Regions:
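An extended, acidic
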Residues: 1-135
Length: 135
């Protein structure tokens, strides 16, 4: 994974995931060339499939954000898994993707930081709405 170009998304729905992400960043950042966020998990996965990124990880995603991207990465010969290394990304919303070597190392780092609370999927249709802004 040394020198890899990675992509991820940042937690925006729940602050408990922030510590989870920061722990991963502390371990991944020194090993990677760069970590980017384009704003779309679908695009990040497409770039991973195309070889622009060497790997991608993000959690608590919705099926419509990852369905096509999972297929693209797999068709390109990459590996996509959930945090258990299994085939449950679509159901769990947790995605780790990349070529075999990057995927293996990235998954090991993420699993060291994983906790049930940090990666529990949030249904965006039931997520708490932000407080209204009053002038």
């Amino acid at each position: 994974m040394k020198g890899s170009f990675l992509a991820t998304g940042y937690p925006w729905r729940a602050l408990p995931t922030l510590d989870f992400y920061l722990g991963i960043f502390r371990d991944v950042f020194p090993l990677s060339k760069a970590i980017r966020r384009c704003g779309s998990a679908a695009l990040d996965l497409a770039y991973t499939a195309a070889g622009v990124y060497d790997g991608f990880f993000e959690f608590r995603l919705s099926p419509w954000d990852i369905g096509a991207g999972i297929l693209m990465v797999r068709e390109a010969g990459g590996i996509v898994s959930d945090l258990d290394g299994g085939d449950g990304s679509f159901a769990s919303g947790n995605v780790v993707a990349g070529g075999p070597a990057v995927h293996r190392e990235l998954l090991a780092i993420i699993r060291r930081h994983a906790s049930e609370q940090a990666i529990e999927r949030v249904n965006p249709l039931q997520a708490a709405s932000p407080e209204p802004v009053t002038p």
